[in-house]
Amino acid sequence: MRSNLCDLGVAACVIHDGRILLVQEAEGSHEGLWGLPKGFVEEGESPSAAAIRELEEECGITGEILGIIGMRECVRNGQTAVFLSYLIRPLSLDVSLNNKEIMNFGWYSIENFESIDWISSTMQSLALTSLAPNQIMKIFDISEQIGYPYSVYLMTNNEKILTEVSI
């Protein structure tokens, strides 16, 4: 039996000059706390497209996905919840905040992390990993070959692997 009952969220890890973009929430249970630009995946939307959309909606920045930095999964109140964090190369740096959702932003280095009121320790860990990535899950977009949006994320730089995998 197939089930699509999943709370699917995404975050944008945007690095510039060794610092990460963080935002301060303006509403909800996280009001006043800091974290990555984030949000939910809409119906019919890929998680990577959602990360780019949320970044643009919250901060006015466009970017391109480089890969996945980390993932959080849990079961809360009987519902599966998955949160994917994407490393994104900024294509613009002119921040224009959505003041309804975000009250402030900043570019932070690791040295500033202890003074930040984080949304969660998981959010802090994702930001830390983004600034010092050991290895990211690289995106292989094979949508053209498949005929619909289709991406594979692998911990490799060997693109030949994809040609050897039957889809």
Predicted regions and their residues:
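Nudix hydrolase/Nudix homology domain
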Residues: E101-I167
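Active-site-adjacent beta-strand/loop module that shapes the phosphate/pyrophosphate-binding cleft
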Residues: E73-V95, G106, N112, L126-P133
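A structural signal for short, well-ordered beta-strand segments
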Residues: A12, I68, Y86-I88
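A short coil-to-beta-strand element that immediately follows conserved catalytic motifs
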Residues: T62-G70
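Conserved N-terminal beta-strand and adjoining loop/helix that marks the start
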Residues: M1-I20
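Conserved Nudix-box catalytic region and its N-terminal flanking loop in Nudix hydrolases
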Residues: R19-E56, Y153-I167
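Short, charged/polar surface micro-motifs in flexible loops or helix N-caps
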Residues: I15-I20, S29-H30, E42, R89-D94, ...
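Short connector loops at helix/strand junctions that flank enzyme active sites
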Residues: D7, I15, L36, G63, ...
